[in-house]
A protein has these predicted regions:
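N-terminal cap/lid segment of alpha/beta-hydrolase-fold proteins
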Residues: 29-68, 480-486, 499-500, 546, ...
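Cap/lid segment of the alpha/beta-hydrolase catalytic domain
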Residues: 59-131, 179-182, 187-188, 319-327, ...
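Accessory cap/linker subdomain of secreted extracellular hydrolases
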Residues: 93, 157-271, 354
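Alpha/beta-hydrolase fold nucleophile elbow
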Residues: 134-147
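Short glycine-enriched nucleophile-adjacent loop
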Residues: 149-160, 498
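C-terminal, loop-rich substrate-recognition/catalytic regions characterized by aromatic stacking residues
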Residues: 215-234, 324-629
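Short beta-strand/loop motif that positions the catalytic acidic residue
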Residues: 279-281
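Active-site-adjacent alpha-helix of alpha/beta-hydrolase-fold enzymes
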Residues: 289-306, 598, 602
């Protein structure tokens, strides 16, 4: 089979390890010593006979495969295996075989695509096939981001015998616990992913005429988005039935139950193979909550070392700036040498100096945002800054959950409300939802802006193009502290306990945490920096596994989980919490009608009331670090 594959020899010598703006020490790895032989489109059989297209990059000496056996770094991707050439250029000269495989039904692979449900079995089959090849020394690691990070965890959940370590970056996992379904709401970036990727890499898109139709659908995604719900057989997506079927099933299924179990790592961490795991994430990544909670779950479930690095990053990017904000030079990290050091330790057995250098001298390394002075950078961004903190664990044991209470008139303070009765009422019109402006979203810039953003409308949001603050909307209820008297560092998970009622049998409540900069010469209107947000659909207020409609007018508690935060709120800044009932298109809009999820025909304006009195003390719980820690 290998002999039949197309052979190519390329020289990738002279690569140098880049010093990192990440700590005080560069990380060592093997020096480049090999050229590369490429074997394209090797068709690797799975246990059911389906063959998956696989590119193999082998260490070479001259025009021949180098003698001996080598550890393997494997990528399994739905995005096209050609994208792994950069990793091959880096790792193969250093004595690794790099393998890139199109997942089932994607790229050049045979079979029918399903959203990750085949990847436990296929990952195990691919790994065991590789382990039996004469150039493999029996040790395999994996790498990749997002969906490609998920295929690593799924292979580990399948307990592939020769899988030695994984390095998932921003892994797309825990779909019933925030990855796709967030508090009962649907993350529309998945809808966008399907609409976009069915036109790129699906089996159907190999037909040029069909590809054109699917691309036209993607080009008009905003119009389709404004006319949800998507109905079976009534859009061009019907020409790719496996994509249409999977998307509709996901959008209809909001309960965190057996349907989502296939990639639920948090609640089934005991199924994960006990191997070294190195997790890489970002505070503005859409999977920030999932990544940090997966770290905590694996630390309890397995004995192998588990390490976590969290930067100020968006999905798949480890740069110093994104959105409207610059985090400073230390935020920019070259991940490849860091991964290389990990592979040297766990695939090659080198232990010299490992654990004495960043980021592996402690289990957790995280970037604390917010040490900057807020000036405007030459490219027009706010300089928020930040610095790296090493920690023995996450969440930080020294972080103290501290309640800040919502008060009448928009105040936010640690004092419990004194009023016997106090509330704020607003109307939520699902035809005019609050727009998404940044935050933990990704991969959908055609419909929403991602990352660290000032909470104003503008051209970056097609549903709110006017350059005015979101706080000017009548359906955004704002609660703000006085200017802080000292720096306040918040690190860890965040939640809002809201007491509320509605005129509808079902509605949403959203919460958003904001670092409010005071007006300055560079930013005369100030700057409202989103730190994270969350949502809870009313029918899932008691359980994420079952629905229970609301009784109109009855007061209920709603516990909203927000994205985690790692930020220093500086002296003179304010901590702000925005409460509303929509965040579109990060989440699908609740029609308030109580109809089945993603099968509604009516939209009803809901009258929603938030309570903030002595008996119904709505609050945000912030993990505060003691001063000087």
């Amino acid at each position: 089979m290998l002999a039949a594959a197309r052979l190519r020899v390329t020289a990738f010598c002279g690569l140098a390890i880049v010093a990192l703006a990440y700590g005080t020490t560069a990380i060592s790895a093997s020096e480049p010593a090999y050229q590369v032989i490429t074997r394209k489109n090797v068709m690797v059989p799975m246990r059911d006979g389906v063959r998956l297209a696989t590119d193999i990059y082998l260490p070479a000496q001259g025009s021949d495969v180098a003698p001996g056996r080598f550890p393997v770094v494997l990528t399994r991707t739905p995005y096209g295996k050609d994208g792994s050439l950069g990793d091959a250029k880096y790792y193969v000269p250093r004595g690794y075989v790099v393998i890139a495989q199109d997942t089932r039904g994607r790229g050049r692979s045979d079979g029918t695509w399903h959203w990750m449900t085949d990847d436990r079995q296929d990952g195990c089959d691919a790994i065991e096939w590789i382990a039996g090849q004469p150039w493999c020394d029996g040790k395999l690691g994996m790498l990749g981001c997002s969906y490609v990070g998920a295929t690593q965890h799924l292979a580990a959940m399948g307990r592939a015998p020769h899988l030695v370590t994984i390095v998932p970056a921003d892994p797309s996992i825990n779909h019933g616990l925030g990855g796709i379904i967030y508090g009962g709401a649907f993350r529309l970036r998945v809808w966008n992913w399907v609409i976009n990727n069915v036109a790129k890499g699906s089996a159907e898109s190999r037909d040029p005429a069909v590809k054109e139709v699917l691309q036209q659908q993607a080009d008009n995604r905003r119009h389709y988005l404004m006319n949800l719900p998507l109905r079976r057989g009534l859009t061009p997506l019907r020409v790719a039935p496996e994509y249409e079927d999977m998307l509709l099933k996901m959008m209809e299924h909001r309960r965190n139950d057996e349907f989502w179990r296939f990639n639920n790592i948090i609640q089934y961490a005991d199924e994960h193979k006990d191997i070294p795991v190195f997790l890489i994430g970002g505070w503005y990544d859409l999977f920030s909550r999932s990544t940090t909670e997966t770290y905590a779950a694996l630390k309890k479930a397995i004995h192998g070392p588990v390490h976590l690095v969290m930067g100020p990053w968006i999905h798949g990017m480890q740069g110093r700036s994104h959105g409207d904000v610059d985090f400073g030079p230390e935020a920019a990290v070259d991940i490849r040498p860091i991964r290389a050091a990990w592979y040297e330790r766990w695939l090659k057995g080198r232990s010299d100096g490992f654990g004495t250098e960043v980021p592996f001298r402690t289990p957790v390394r995280m970037f604390v945002m917010g040490s900057g002075d807020g000036h405007k950078t030459p490219d027009g961004k706010l300089y928020h800054g930040g610095y790296w903190r090493d920690a023995a664990d996450y969440p930080l044991p020294e972080a103290r959950p501290t309640k800040y209470y919502l008060h009448a008139g928009g105040a936010l303070s640690p004092s419990v409300p004194a009023e016997k009765q106090s509330s704020t009422t607003f109307e939520f019109d699902p035809k005019n939802p609050v727009p998404t402006v940044g935050g933990c979203v990704c991969c959908a810039r055609q419909i929403m802006a991602d990352g660290a953003r000032n909470q104003w409308g503008g051209e970056h949001t097609f549903t709110w193009p006017a350059p005015i603050p979101l706080s000017a909307r009548n359906d955004v209820i704002v609660f703000t502290t006085p200017p802080l008297e000292h720096d306040t560092e918040i690190v860890g998970p965040i939640s809002v306990q809201l007491w509320a009622c509605s005129s509808a049998v079902d509605t949403d409540f959203t919460a958003k945490l904001i670092d409010v900069y005071p007006p300055s010469k560079d930013f005369p209107a100030g700057f409202d920096l989103i730190m994270g947000d969350g949502v809870l659909r009313g029918r899932y207020r008691e359980s994420d596994k079952s629905e229970k409609m609301m009784t109109p007018g009855q007061v209920y508690p709603f516990r909203i989980t927000l994205d985690p935060c790692c930020n220093r709120f500086k002296k003179g800044h304010r901590i702000r919490v925005d409460i509303s009932s929509s965040n579109f298109p990060r989440f699908d809009v609740n029609p308030n009608s109580g109809e089945p999820m993603h099968d509604y025909r009516r939209m009803i304006t809901a009258v929603n009331t938030i309570y903030h009195d002595r008996e119904h003390a709505s609050q945000i719980v912030l993990p505060l670090l003691p001063a000087g820690r």
